[in-house]
Amino acid sequence: LCGLEKRCKGILEKEGTSYSSKQRLKICYMVMQDVNHQLFTESVLEEVLLSMPGKDSDESPENVAKAEAILTEMDLLPYKACHPMGLSGGQKQRVAIASAIASERPVILFDEPTSGLDLFHMRQVADSVKGLADSGKTIVIVTHDPEFILRCCNYVIHLENGRLEENYFLQDTEGRERLFNFFMMEGGGGNQTV
């Protein structure tokens, strides 16, 4: 979806506009399951500043204030001077999510965003992700976490071995029952992703 895999083919279309792989790299942001591959700077604050759009992504007072607000939302402000690699797995995950928020990209893909998160922070991240979607951003979440799905998703696509199995809305009881049945079935095995 983000245009990172050259061997994958397909079209991303948003609001009637089709995007090439190169264009997708500019409009998409991806939070990887293993965030250790996407943390590059010497501090948590610098990591968030790095993701901000434009060439003015420096430590101007305005950018720092915005970054600190995002870090506060992710419960990370006390760690702003810490090296990202010195944080716990869940804290690193939240730094990557904070960077995604700071990027202001219109399409954000989250791959297993709750890995390493405790219940409190999972709910906090779900609220932030829902806020991004409510602000008009397109959010795609790859996860096996039913509580996270129910807290911030409105549409589910089930993939099995790379093929579309089913898709549905979650706003009604039928959709929630389908999700519940999916996870009950998943417990029995299979290579399924939501």
Question: What are the residue ranges of the model-derived segments?
Answer:
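Conserved ABC ATPase "signature" region
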Residues: 60-79
